[in-house]
Structure formats: C-alpha cells, structure tokens
Curated annotation (Swiss-Prot):
It comes from Erythrobacter litoralis (strain HTCC2594). One of its GO terms (biological process) is L-histidine biosynthetic process. It is an enzyme of class 4 (lyase). This is Imidazoleglycerol-phosphate dehydratase. CDD domains: IGPD. Pathway: Amino-acid biosynthesis; L-histidine biosynthesis; L-histidine from 5-phospho-alpha-D-ribose 1-diphosphate: step 6/9. Gene3D superfamilies: Imidazole glycerol phosphate dehydratase, domain 1 (3.30.230.40). Its main location: cytoplasm.
Length: 197
C-alpha cells in the first residue's frame, strides 16, 4: 500500500497529514478554514486518494500559515507515498467543467517542481478563505511533491465554481498520474532511469 504520513510542527502550525494513493477517496479534513476543508475534500473524493488532514494554525494572525503549511505537508506526504515513482503513469490532465466554468489542469510528477497558474477571482474571499491564497496553495503542494503543474481557467464567472473546477481537475489529473501501469513492470517512467533533477 502506497501511503505517506507527515507531522509538521512549527511555532505557527501543528499539522498531521496521512494519504493513501490506493484509497477510495475517503477523507477527514479539519484546517479551521471551512472553504479550504471543502476543497481538500473535493481533491480526495475525485482523486480517490484517502486524505487525513488535521491542522491547528495561528488563524488569529491570518490564514496564510495554515494554507501554506498544510499544502507543504500534503505535498510531502504525497511524495513519501510515491516513493521512487516506479510504475506510475507520471502524467495527468483533465478538463473540468462546473456549470458555466471550464478549467484545464495538466501535471507531471517529474521531481522538478514548477507551477503555472492562470486563473483569477473577482472577489477577495470564498467563505472566509482569501482567494489570493489559492494559487499559493497549489504552488506549495507542487513544490513539496516535486510536481510540474499547469492550471488554466478557460472561462467562468462564479468564483466558487472556478475554484472547485480547478481542485476537481487537479484531483482527476493526479489520479491519472499516480495510477500504476502494469505494462511498465515497475520501471521508473523516464529514459534517465530516475525522476528529478
């Protein structure tokens, strides 16, 4: 079973993350930020990656540390669960419609973190979550997990739909990328014989 577990404790946040790449999309998420919880739950449900995320952060300051640190820990847990990445699909891509909104997500579990985020929001908050932190969340996950990640909003007007479309697209692309392909016989999916660098 491909699992990862990260405990990350700082003066700003205390975090426990557990993931199971071969799960069923079960989740237990509590960050203290309701809309972020909702998005991580969407990620788990649509990627079929089981996610436990428990965060006690300094929300009396603002939401930045909780958002960033939970994303870093999630990326680290995903990286731990992937191990040497033998046999994985490596690449994933998804178009994700939600009513009037359509987004596109493409990713490569390459070991070379890079994020392109081309989406904007017309309001400052979704629930109580600052929308400027959405891009930062994806950057932090990709950096910690070693993922090349491209996110593009093709069109859409409703901010909730835009965010949820992106998270669901990320989930579906991750499902493709982490899936084991029996034809590869456990080989590393790179002509270099390794991923990263």
């Amino acid at each position: 079973m491909r699992t990862g577990r990260i405990e990350r404790n700082t003066a700003e946040t205390r975090i426990l993350i557990e993931v199971n790449l071969d799960g069923r999309g079960n989740y237990d998420v509590s960050t203290g930020i309701g809309f972020l919880d909702h998005m991580v739950e969407q990620f788990s449900k649509h990627s079929l990656i089981d996610v436990t995320m428990k965060v006690d952060g300094d929300l009396h300051v603002d939401q930045h540390h909780t958002t960033e640190d939970s994303a870093i820990a999630l990326g680290q847990a995903l990286g731990e669960a992937l191990g040497d990445k033998a046999g994985i699909g490596r690449y994933g891509q998804a178009y994700s419609p939600m009513d009037e909104t359509l987004s596109r997500v493409a990713l490569d579990i390459s070991g070379r973190p890079y994020t392109v985020f081309r989406a904007g929001f017309s309001q400052e908050k979704l629930g109580e979550w600052d929308t400027e932190l959405i891009e930062h969340w994806f950057q932090s996950v990709a950096q910690a997990a070693g993922i090349t990640l491209h996110i593009e909003l093709l069109y859409g007007t409703n901010n909730h739909h835009i965010c949820e479309s992106i998270y669901k697209g990320f989930a579906r692309a991750m499902r493709q990328a982490v899936e084991l392909d029996g034809r590869k016989g456990g080989a590393i999916p790179s002509t270099k014989g390794q991923l990263g660098g």
